[in-house]
Amino acid sequence: MGKTHACTDPHHHVHDAAGFVAAVERACNERGLRLTAIRARVLGLVAQAGRPIKAYDLLEQVREGEGAGAAAPPTVYRALDFLLANGFIHKLESINAFVACHHPNSAQHSVPFLICDRCHSATELEDASIVATLDAAARGLGFAPQAQTLEVHGRCARCARAR
């Protein structure tokens, strides 16, 4: 199996949200995409969250910052859809929440996540062999994978020590 690296510090958190948004803006420019103000705002909130964040919480924060009429739910959902489709954020399906992608300049990729059921942290694992093994196993069974979501629930190291 390939080398596994966890992207976490100590949890899935981008410490320089403005720098992260700027990196995504550069990636958008390189790809001919447009990072609108609302997309940048939603991306910044996801990056600052320090934990997986739900769409409703994002909507609430956008409204707090810009006024109650500033953002309707479809606006935030469209921003999330854009950020997801272009690989700038990940959706944790099992908890219906979002986290920033630690590789905004790379092409879309599937990564496994470790999700702590106690503190709700999410750790992005970098191990291409895990994804490749799943893909190969599926194809070996005649299955044509379209997308992969691998989420492992348990306790992070900090919570496991705190029993």
Region spans (language model):
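Short capping segments at the starts of secondary-structure elements
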Residues: Q48-K54
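N-terminal leader segment of winged-helix/HTH proteins
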Residues: M1-R34
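A short acidic, leucine-rich amphipathic alpha-helix
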Residues: D57-R63, V76
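Pre-recognition alpha-helix immediately N-terminal to the DNA-recognition helix
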Residues: A40-L45
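Basic amphipathic alpha-helical segments that dock to polyanions
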Residues: V76-N86
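Non-DNA-binding regulatory cores of transcription-related proteins
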Residues: A85-R163
